[in-house]
Amino acid sequence: MQESINDLNINPQGIYIDATFGRGGHSKAILNRLTTGRLIAFDKDLDAISYARENFQFSNFEIVHASFASIYDYCLQHSLLGKIDGIIMDLGVSSPQLDNAARGFSFTHNGPLDMRMDVSKGITASQALEELSVDDLSYIFKVYGEERFAKKIALRIKDYIQQNGSIRTTLELAELIRATIGKKEKKNPATRCFQALRIYVNNELKDLEALLENILAVIKSGGRIAVISFHSLEDRIVKQKFSALINPKQELNRITKMLPQDSSQIKLKWITKKSKANEDELNQNVRSRSAILRVVEKL
């Protein structure tokens, strides 16, 4: 979303972080606006790291193989706390990850049931299905995927694994889900469970919460944070965190019934409260239809 770059209000001499490099779309747009400034990009995906090293050989650019949850620690180690002019985060799975069946994210193209963004560590989605109990699996589908038939699907999966040993491929899982609940809407019936499993395997929501918890220490006064989310769980976390720092009086009164707080507790202000992709962006990338942009500035 071009709006996300515009709303960062790039300082040509500033220090910026692209928390989710992907294939460098946002990084390239930021670098084009920098003169003596620098950009630090993060990604868990080794394919993204390789792409950055091959195609972004700029003296003012650095790529870090790590989750964005480690941004605070990186800034602490490099004496950058409170010196960052802006951070952009484009959450969720990237198009190259979805389009590569071998990565295991797609429920329409067959591949190994992996789903790890960082294939150098962690358990695969296939292993997770084997190790999780029915109750845990049902919880993941319900909470991370907002799946109405979570328990029914979890029971069917565990029964299938007991009879067949494992679920090894993406289409094997997608077909099992479809056979369990049928096709009741336009969306592929496997959509929610695949999302939930991916979030679990990659600790996506925990990583997001970890970054947002320390983000004020990273950003300088006047610095901006732009977050693009693609589903309600991510967006809810972002909105609630930002809202609590923009209007602490409202949050505290509603939750704790405490007296109104003084204005010194207000840490952020809205630049873009909520924005969706425009028609041109939708024509270029249909996957952006569910994207929500929120941008704040540190006071």
UniProtKB/Swiss-Prot annotation:
Compartments in which it is found: Cytoplasm
GO CC term (a single one): cytoplasm
UniProtKB keywords: Cytoplasm, Methyltransferase, rRNA processing, S-adenosyl-L-methionine, Transferase
Pfam families membership: Methyltransf_5 (PF01795)
GO biological process, one term: rRNA base methylation
EC number of the protein: 2.1.1.199
UniProt similarity note: Belongs to the methyltransferase superfamily. RsmH family.
Protein's recorded name: Ribosomal RNA small subunit methyltransferase H
Native source species: Francisella tularensis subsp. tularensis (strain WY96-3418)
Gene (UniProt): rsmH
